[in-house]
């Protein structure tokens, strides 16, 4: 029953995220999780700045190799963080809180490999959800006490899924 609940919660979270994007017209802020993997920072910037609605993009590169971006559209700010390894996109996080998204991306991606920690406490809940057939990627959600929803993509790792879970422990 516990595993069944863990399966349903991310599905509900996905519904909330995507319906929220439609209502606030923030869909432009989300990159395609599969199509954009391996792209350079320049490719991502070019794609984002070409988006419609007169959106603006401000970005900065930190010493640890992360790109922090603020995407503004329709008067709404959406904070983006992208991680690049060897000049290739390996992960991204989005949030409407600049503090939250920076901490998220630093906690779960480093310059050499992807780190994931699943935890639950009274402040937030983290879920890992693997939809191997549809997205070939891992979709990571955080739903904290402030009601913020974040989505976090990493590439799906080929091989036995049990080996993948064991590697995370």
What are these regions (language model features)?
Residues 1-19:
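Sec-dependent bacterial lipoprotein signal peptides
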Residues 6, 38, 151-154:
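Intrinsic structural disorder/low-complexity segments
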Residues 8-11, 27, 154-155:
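Alpha-helical interaction segments
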Residues 17-19, 55, 124, 137:
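Short intrinsically disordered, low-complexity segments
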Residues 21-110, 157-169:
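Short helix/turn-capping signatures at newly exposed starts of structured segments
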């Amino acid at each position: 029953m516990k595993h069944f609940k863990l399966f349903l919660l991310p599905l509900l979270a996905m519904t909330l995220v995507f319906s929220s994007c439609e209502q606030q017209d923030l869909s432009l802020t989300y990159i395609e999780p599969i199509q954009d993997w391996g792209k350079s920072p320049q490719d991502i910037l070019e794609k984002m700045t070409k988006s419609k609605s007169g959106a603006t993009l401000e970005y900065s590169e930190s010493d640890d190799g992360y790109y922090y971006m603020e995407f503004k559209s329709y008067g709404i700010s959406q904070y983006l963080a992208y991680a690049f390894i060897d000049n290739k996109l390996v992960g991204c996080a989005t949030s409407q809180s600049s503090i939250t998204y920076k901490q998220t991306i630093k906690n779960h991606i480093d310059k050499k490999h992807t780190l994931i920690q699943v935890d639950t406490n009274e402040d937030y809940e983290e879920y890992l959800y693997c939809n191997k057939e549809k997205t070939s990627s891992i979709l990571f959600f955080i739903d904290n006490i402030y009601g913020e929803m974040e989505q976090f993509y990493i590439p799906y790792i080929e091989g036995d899924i049990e080996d993948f879970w064991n590697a995370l422990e």
